[in-house]
């Protein structure tokens, strides 16, 4: 999800949490050693879902990242970025059930190898082939098979650390696709059903990845939110808190703490990705809460709450905003992350998402939300200087201090 979309929401918190003995995977152990090749990271928007009018999006193609990937990666060096987020374009890879063409992913993978770039891959990032129904058992089977095939590909074509998210933003897809009809499959009243399906599928796909790559580090990116109720209305306060804590449901299900019948356990959750935008806080069923307002919750507190609940290494998997607010927003998030680290929270990175301006999902409008603009015919992209300057200003403070010295266990 990019900042040009909408507020992120989950679903009302479920009751009947089941506690199970916790058995973390080796990769999930909290460490003071940096996990990623770089702390500052870049996310290449890769959504491929279909719109209500039947048009399929392909943001990798519309930003021409597939065409100019070498130039895109070479530009990252100017900012010390060595870690990126990319996604599989499932509709291109599996045009017929069980027949796989990974050429679109190999183009990205081999460019990354040429430039010394480390990739955090999403297997599923909102889009799937036309022949599948996301609510069906066959969809879960297909995602599991795709993950296994991709694991085999990574084993054959890459070395070193591998980071993979089976499903990106379970909560957002379940809300937007299952309750708000904002995104494919455009349903209402099926959010809980869709969330369970995505969790069940993610668990199976994660196990398929690990069967091929025992040392794979499984990443789970989810939106974090803050919602405030009307203090004069106790029912509204309770409703807001239930809504707010729904942001934990996907992670709770993946770990088997909630609905263990879906197959989750603690070993599925290695690294938590926290997705946080400038519209992720709002009044219950009301307006956005902005920074500077008394009800706005500091991001460092959200990071602490997530860490204390799961005791996993964290990174900011997505953050950004549009237009002239970009530099100020980056500075805010960066400073909050540094404050969290200083307080002992193991945050291992900040990913600017998206790193490239892109066409709007619904209207193709020019979204000025990246560090670089649309590609010119020769592949050159104009940098947004105010954001570039703010990035250099903030990151220069850290370059003389290796960031592992700032990470502390709590």
Give each language-model segment a name:
Residues 85-88:
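Active-site gating/metal-coordination segments in enzymes
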């Amino acid at each position: 999800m990019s900042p040009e979309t909408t507020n992120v929401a989950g679903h009302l918190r479920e009751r009947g949490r089941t506690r199970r003995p916790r058995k973390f995977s080796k990769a999930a152990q909290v460490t003071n050693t940096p996990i990623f090749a770089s702390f500052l990271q870049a996310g290449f928007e890769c959504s491929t879902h279909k719109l209500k009018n039947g048009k399929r999006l392909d943001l990798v193609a519309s930003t021409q990242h597939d065409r100019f990937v070498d130039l895109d990666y070479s530009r990252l060096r100017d900012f010390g970025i060595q870690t990126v987020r990319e996604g599989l374009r499932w509709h291109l890879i599996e045009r017929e059930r069980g027949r796989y063409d990974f050429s679109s992913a190999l183009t990205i993978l081999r460019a990354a190898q040429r430039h010394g770039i480390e990739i955090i891959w999403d297997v599923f990032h909102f889009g799937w082939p036309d022949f599948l129904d996301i609510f069906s058992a066959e969809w879960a089977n297909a995602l599991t098979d795709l993950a296994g095939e991709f694991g085999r590909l990574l084993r054959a074509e890459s070395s070193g650390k591998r980071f993979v998210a089976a499903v990106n933003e379970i909560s957002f897809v379940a809300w937007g696709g299952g309750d708000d009809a904002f995104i494919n499959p455009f349903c209402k009243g099926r959010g809980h059903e869709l969330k369970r399906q995505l969790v069940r599928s993610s668990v199976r796909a994660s196990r398929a990845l690990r069967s091929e790559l025992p040392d794979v580090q499984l990443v789970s990116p989810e939106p974090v939110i803050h919602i405030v109720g009307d203090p004069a209305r106790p029912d509204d306060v309770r409703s807001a808190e239930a809504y707010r804590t729904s942001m934990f449901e996907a992670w709770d299900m993946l770990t088997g703490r909630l609905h263990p019948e879906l197959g989750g356990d603690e070993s599925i959750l290695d690294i938590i990705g926290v997705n946080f935008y400038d519209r992720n806080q709002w009044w219950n069923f009301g307006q956005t809460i902005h920074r500077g307002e008394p009800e706005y919750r500091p991001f460092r507190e959200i990071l602490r709450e997530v860490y204390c609940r799961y005791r996993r290494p964290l990174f900011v998997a997505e953050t950004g905003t549009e237009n002239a607010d970009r530099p100020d927003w980056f500075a805010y998030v960066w400073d909050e992350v540094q404050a969290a680290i200083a307080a002992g929270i193991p945050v291992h990175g900040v990913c600017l998402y998206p790193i490239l301006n892109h066409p709007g999902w619904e209207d193709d409008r020019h979204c000025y939300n990246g560090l670089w603009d649309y590609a010119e015919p020769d592949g050159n992209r104009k940098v947004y200087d105010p954001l570039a300057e703010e990035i250099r200003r903030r990151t220069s403070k850290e370059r003389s201090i290796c960031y592992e010295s700032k990470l502390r266990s709590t």
